[in-house]
């Protein structure tokens, strides 16, 4: 089950496990992106999180809206299906 919180941010939308690319580090390490999530710390800005298979955030991008996050993600990967996290209504 996808976590409700990532890096202390509330998860609003997430994806099923899939190949969303990879992150290459300067030391030669490669991490694969298995999940995408749209999160917020304060509801003023939204983050597009790239997560590994352990739900750890390995890259993030900041946007002004959820729609901007979704639009950016769709430029990199087509046919993304977003799942609304209904648990965030309690926060």
Positions of PLM-derived features:
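Intrinsically disordered, low-complexity boundary segments flanking structured domains
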Residues: 1-2, 49, 70
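Negatively charged, low-complexity tracts enriched in Asp/Glu with abundant Ser/Thr
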Residues: 1-29
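Short linear sequence elements within intrinsically disordered, low-complexity coil regions
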Residues: 17-19, 25, 30, 51-54, ...
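Short aromatic-glycine-(Arg/Gly/Cys) micro-motifs in beta-strand/loop hairpins
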Residues: 30-58
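Mixed-charge, Lys/Arg-enriched low-complexity segments
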Residues: 53-91
């Amino acid at each position: 089950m996808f976590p409700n919180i990532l890096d202390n941010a509330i998860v609003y939308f997430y994806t099923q496990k899939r190949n969303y690319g990879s992150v290459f580090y300067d030391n030669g390490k490669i991490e694969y992106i298995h999940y995408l999530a749209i999160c917020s710390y304060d509801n003023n800005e939204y983050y597009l999180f790239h997560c590994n298979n352990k739900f750890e955030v390995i890259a993030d991008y900041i946007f002004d809206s959820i729609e901007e996050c979704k639009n950016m993600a769709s430029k990199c990967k087509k046919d993304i299906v977003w799942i609304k996290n209904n648990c965030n209504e309690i926060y």
